[in-house]
Amino acid sequence: MARVTVEDCLEKVDNRFMLVMMASKRVKQLYKGAKPLIDPKNNRHVVTSLREIAAGKLSAELSSKRSA
């Protein structure tokens, strides 16, 4: 995959807002030391998280709990 686009990710996640939430949460996990699910190839964490989503390595899980 030469470039990752929003359209690539939207094939896996239907909602743009959910995509943003997933990517931002994954970026935080990567910054805290989580292992990448794909080869990062010297990419920034944002690009790595989007590549993981486009590759189908991450999925959204909705919770009925609301945080205050």
Swiss-Prot record:
This is DNA-directed RNA polymerase subunit omega. The gene is rpoZ. It comes from Trichlorobacter lovleyi (strain ATCC BAA-1151 / DSM 17278 / SZ). One of its GO terms (biological process) is DNA-templated transcription. GO terms for cellular component: DNA-directed RNA polymerase complex. It catalyses: RNA(n) + a ribonucleoside 5'-triphosphate = RNA(n+1) + diphosphate. PANTHER family: DNA-DIRECTED RNA POLYMERASE SUBUNIT OMEGA. Pfam families: RNA_pol_Rpb6. Promotes RNA polymerase assembly. Latches the N- and C-terminal regions of the beta' subunit thereby facilitating its interaction with the beta and alpha subunits. The RNAP catalytic core consists of 2 alpha, 1 beta, 1 beta' and 1 omega subunit. When a sigma factor is associated with the core the holoenzyme is formed, which can initiate transcription. SUPFAM superfamilies: RPB6/omega subunit-like. SMART domains: RNA_pol_Rpb6. One of its GO terms (molecular function) is DNA-directed RNA polymerase activity. Belongs to the RNA polymerase subunit omega family. Keywords: DNA-directed RNA polymerase, Nucleotidyltransferase, Transcription, Transferase.
